[in-house]
């Protein structure tokens, strides 16, 4: 991937006499000497290709030049004996295409010298805050520290600039998402072959997660949802402890992660291999909405417009079943959006200044119906690549037609 080109695009949006400082992050402490698996800051990864802790990217733009410096930890033989090898200077250069790589202990001095020369007026940080987060991330904490240390300099947010770039995937990124989806497909076939009454939800989850790792994924894109029966009506249920009963459905919302890029797929399977008449009626409504979104999505549209299209199809179907009397009552059974962007994050970033779809965007297509009184939760989710004239369903090969699902599960 062309990380140098991405940095060039960021430089174009930065003001002169400014600097961008991005931190990869640090380990998250759990308890005693236990740390959570490290996840690098996604924007740091996007601009460098590196996903290790304790790294810093410095991009400086003055009146005369643009300069990029990468700071990494120096190798410590004792630490490496316990925790594995660090990225070397040569490896960091090769991955990131950054020639100027220095060790981390020189970072503060480099910044102090840069600020003392009086050719920097403002500092950019990644101050993105997801709508559900109530705690600042590491980059936000560091931004506050720098604002206090250098009070005469403006602190600015670069997150929307990078978000706008991330919304349009290049060919390399699309290829990685395709691979993540392909691995997800193989794992779902394995799940369907083994799903049967009496299984625990966590066993279906285990079948999926075993197969994605076996086929080369680095792990799941997000915690696997495996909700059977009434649990399928809970949008983000991930306890996955109940038994899959005969005659019930199993809703699985899941995805593989491959080289940093995510798949996000939902399929709803009959536990015993055959949908009941009522389940089939609801399934057909959701599938019709899924197909209508895929048929309609194109450049210039917004996710809100796609959601309204899905709601109309779902509402019409629910009125035919007698579940609702008016179209605006559909919120009783469908209470989320039909789409979000997909990429490095499963709920990938969006730029507030530009919410219309452009070629290269990858979005989800995930209508659903959640009917508590029938203990039926059905969601069908695919991943769409927006093209010049419409869209391509990247997950088309993952079977969703109910006849095909029943035939596949019967032949096992």
Question: What positions do the PLM features span?
Answer:
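Active-site neighborhoods and metal-handling regions in enzymes and metal-associated proteins
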Residues: 1-412
